């Protein structure tokens, strides 16, 4: 599903649902033209099957997978984030960097190592290297850049352990930052972006390799190491380093680079790459640097939570009912649904013992808090019209409570393990209270009072109690307040006064993104599509492997296997970076102003982001999360400190010993959160989830036993349940119970049934059009000063300043000046005393 090249995507009009997408491609990604064949394809038949089997070890057909000890955070561990910057193909360049540094260093210092010099000598040599970046000869400049990269990599040739390398990295990078290296690198990067000769040469080449992006890769490596290291706070950091960190963050988010924040330059590189004008750009490094730049300037998720609490207090709203990060961390994963083979066995048992099966079904329906998915019938492909034979003629569980025997008493020990209470405090919107009161008034009194939520005259006592409970759990979001304030500005532009827009980093970034935001979103989604494991190689798809393919293709099976792992790892890192960038931007824009968030979200929807994410999840997700596409002995800094052992096919197949791949689980959670943000309270987009048959895809993702991932899957299933029909709900009672357990409740939200007014099939196109009109009015009012209404512009009423202004009069007026003077001045009486008072 290609991201759209422009206008709105296929929304549902007048309840005419578009046809579902064609069957998804197989879950094995084919590399673009010029890429190496998958490693397994070069092996003999039995060996290839064994290799593929090991790659998918313990990921198919096992409902009882172990709990994943995964803690969601802004980033992975520092060492892991550093190692993912380099592809394994770049390995030989570490020694090249060292050689360039030592050749230059020995000219100036003959008797000492870098680690033996004092701070002043370090600073002197760093400034000498910086001066070397200003030479015009490209080869000399590249050698100096490599020497600086070696310093930023921790001068590993003089270190004996990984910890020592990381310690010297921090010291060296703050030293480089102090002497002004980053700004010099930005200028060089700008020059390389505009290097027309390199771009035209790359466009003409049939196959682009690592050598075409050497200059860019060296610059981006240094900049990434600086941003990533300065952003990370460590115990034992010097006091001046904290000051430098704050200054660097402020500069990085300010419009200091071509009057734009640095992130806009990187977004420009992404769009230039996707347009085909610069196919040699090393996109993985650009996206990683873009992610870390956005993270450094805007702040991570914990910082976002504190900013949200602060903003609520400024707007006079009550504090948040709970810290969502802490609640999610304390949640436990539920058992995943049974596999298809388990379902067949269950159906056979039901055929033999139908009566007992019904009793067991009822017992388990009573909100089993320990294993809400246990014995859930999760077939691989579920449709609305599926008929489960064991449920034919069966009444709904709640309707047969009188007939069925009471639930069996569980032992007391079992009860002790059950979580007490629900994890989230319920919420109610002002709109929900209004709707409840309106329906109650029309039912009991026969009148309505609009948006009045206080008058309860004539309503029965139970209704009073209900309203009291609803108001106790009333939650007003920052977005609602911002939307109301925007309506007020548009309704009364004069009395409202001038809006004071605080220039926080998110505001500065949005102003930079605004002119080309649709193009940026389309470009990111194009790269995400190319990197997704379910994508097939197409002749017109972009080649994202320019910075991983060597100049000479591998000639042995072992080299092919190594390159196959490298290519898969490369794609996984790209997915990780894009998912993190999109989620960070959505969350920060929503906090800064709701219409900034809606503008970005709407363009993601128009570019087919929803079906793209569903296509990503339409694979064996356990296989993706447990994939072992890494070679730990080749990871930095291990590879520069220790002697490399001889690689064998067995060691490559074994991969690492981790239970799961951190970056892949992180990417999956991010994509689910993005999907949740795009569809929340948007019925037209929720219908897209239904039309694209997302329910079975999402249910398969519940097999991953990780609480946070399960929570966001259940949220996405919850918004659809009212549209999926009675049969789906009957067949998935365990999933319904899990939603009740783990997802926040909205009082009066009839999510489990189709009775809600919002669930009825309206013209959903109108909903998107109204939202788009609000967004355009907001952008025009706040940012489009050139087209603002002249009647509402401020007027200078001071006589002296007005008379002192120089006015350029048109020629025809000057020629007829006497006539104007006679008509407008001399023939009209003027009370000069009143005028001058």
From Swiss-Prot:
Record's keyword annotation contains Phosphoprotein: yes
Residue numbers bearing the Phosphoserine modification: 59, 335, 339, 788
One GO cellular component term noted in the UniProt record for this chain: FAR/SIN/STRIPAK complex
Composition bias, Basic and acidic residues: 47-60, 356-377
GO-annotated molecular function: protein-macromolecule adaptor activity
Cellular localisation: Cytoplasm
Chain spans, region Required for STRIPAK core complex formation: 796-837
Main location per the UniProt record: cytoplasm
Modified residues (N-acetylmethionine): 1
Keyword set, alphabetical order: Acetylation, Cytoplasm, Phosphoprotein
Alphabetical GO biological process terms: cortical actin cytoskeleton organization; negative regulation of hippo signaling; regulation of cell morphogenesis
Residue numbers spanned by region Disordered: 1-67, 333-423
Record field: compositional bias (Acidic residues): 378-391
Family membership: Belongs to the STRIP family.
Role description: Plays a role in the regulation of cell morphology and cytoskeletal organization. Required in the cortical actin filament dynamics and cell shape. Part of the striatin-interacting phosphatase and kinase (STRIPAK) complexes. STRIPAK complexes have critical roles in protein (de)phosphorylation and are regulators of multiple signaling pathways including Hippo, MAPK, nuclear receptor and cytoskeleton remodeling. Different types of STRIPAK complexes are involved in a variety of biological processes such as cell growth, differentiation, apoptosis, metabolism and immune regulation.
Quaternary organization: Part of the core of STRIPAK complexes composed of PP2A catalytic and scaffolding subunits, the striatins (PP2A regulatory subunits), the striatin-associated proteins MOB4, STRIP1 and STRIP2, PDCD10 and members of the STE20 kinases, such as STK24 and STK26. The STRIPAK complex can be extended by adapter proteins such as SLMAP:SIKE1, CTTNBP2 or CTTNBP2NL. Interacts with CDC42BPB. Interacts with CTTNBP2NL.
The protein's name in its UniProt record: Striatin-interacting protein 1
Organism: Pongo abelii (Sumatran orangutan)
Lineage of the species this protein comes from: Eukaryota, Metazoa, Chordata, Craniata, Vertebrata
